[in-house]
Amino acid sequence: MKVVVTGFDPFGGEAINPAFEAVKKLPAEIAGAEIIKVEVPTVFGTSGEKVAEAIETHQPDMVICVGQAGGRETVTVEKVAINLAEARIPDNAGQQPSDVPLVEDGATAYFTNLPIKAMVKNCHDHQLPAAISYTAGTFVCNDIMYHLLHLINTKYPTIRGGFIHVPFLPEQTIDKPTFASMSLEAITDSLFYMIEAAVKTQEDIQLQGGTTH
């Protein structure tokens, strides 16, 4: 089995992006699956193109994209991506789209086909906090997830894929004292256990979850 794992470059004035820093620290193999690491630009459209190129090149069985969500308290795996670009800040190419679809005539939204409950439970079983998120935002993280799932739903039906958000690193919050952070080691371990569960689990487990707001 091959798993492509992508991580973004720094954006929004940050000098580092914990997403790719953690991806780089993953081992070359997890649960018998080859881990292929790819850095992608924080740019609308281009990030999805890089995923398409990685799929063409490596022919993976699974693609997991990883991005930074400053302000989140823990690693979160995303349930859904929506067909909308709404950028509060410019991307790394200076684009700042507002209220435009990511794919003309594309589906309104796509659900991940990863076993996200099993992924979260595997983190909990190893004493690591983790959660399911029901919004990937409207910036490039949602963009890459939507384009990945669009490819899966229209061209690569046997591939499983989805997106994981990670918090700031402690050094990123020195001037943001109210923001949560997580060590690079803990983020990397969380990614490892999420990927391990995704590789080992075909049918997701039954586990009560959800949010009230």
Curated annotation (Swiss-Prot):
Superkingdom of source: Bacteria
One annotated GO molecular function: pyroglutamyl-peptidase activity
Enzyme class: hydrolase
This protein's record includes keyword Transmembrane: no
Alphabetized InterPro entries for the sequence: Peptidase_C15, Peptidase_C15-like, Peptidase_C15-like_sf, PGP-I_bact-type, PGPEP1_Cys_AS, PGPEP1_Glu_AS
An annotated GO BP: proteolysis
Coiled coil: none
UniProt key word Nucleotide-binding: no
EC id: 3.4.19.3
Cellular component terms (Gene Ontology): cytosol
Name of a matching Pfam family: Peptidase_C15
Cellular compartment(s): Cytoplasm
Catalytic activity of the protein: Release of an N-terminal pyroglutamyl group from a polypeptide, the second amino acid generally not being Pro
Active-site residues, record numbering mapped to chain: E78, C141, H165
Keyword set, alphabetical order: Cytoplasm, Hydrolase, Protease, Thiol protease
Protein function: Removes 5-oxoproline from various penultimate amino acid residues except L-proline.
Family assignment from sequence similarity: Belongs to the peptidase C15 family.
Subunit structure: Homotetramer.
This protein's name: Pyrrolidone-carboxylate peptidase
